[in-house]
């Protein structure tokens, strides 16, 4: 029984790390990356539609994104959505496609992005700790119901703590890498 709880705990912690890494992908580090626009939604025929469903997004060079809409009539709406997303990006259109030059990051902007990364890291750690709390609660219920002994409870709780420590250190490692990437000029 306690093995099942540990397996579920590990899966949930993996999901928390994966979600954190997806969040980090949207943080700009000076390079052009299509995932920068993942959170951009466009008002398209009355519905909020993700930009990546309305167009293809390419990276022709290190500091340039090119958006080619499937429907050319949506270009104006796409430009508005990018500006509204407050990513610090300025789209320019030639009627067929939208180009976004990725500006070099200022020192001030780099520091802001590092703060954002740290906030995401803290949220990920909280998610991992919540998984730990839930797992410990499940283990206590198993012990209360007589499915596991007190010794098994203690051993399993220690295993859950080891998992928590492992995933928190993974988050710290990923965070350090991202901070280094952001602060690189």
Curated annotation (Swiss-Prot):
Q: What is this protein called?
A: Ribosome-recycling factor
Q: Which gene encodes it?
A: frr
Organism annotation: Bacillus subtilis (strain 168)
GO-annotated molecular function: ribosomal large subunit binding
Q: What happens when the gene is disrupted?
A: No sporulation at 37 or 47 degrees Celsius.
Under SUPFAM superfamilies, the record lists: Ribosome recycling factor, RRF (SSF55194)
Q: Membrane-spanning regions, if any?
A: none
Q: Which CDD domains match?
A: RRF
What sections of the sequence does the record tag as coiled-coil?
A: none
GO cellular component term of the entry, any: cytoplasm
Question: Where would you find this protein in the cell?
Answer: Cytoplasm
rRNA-binding is among the record's keywords: no
The record's section on HAMAP family has:
RRF (MF_00040)
Q: What does this protein do?
A: Responsible for the release of ribosomes from messenger RNA at the termination of protein biosynthesis. May increase the efficiency of translation by recycling ribosomes from one round of translation to another. Plays a role in sporulation.
A GO BP entry: translation
Query: Mind telling me which Gene3D superfamilies this protein's record contains?
Result: 3.30.1360.40, Ribosome-recycling factor
Which family does the record assign? Belongs to the RRF family.
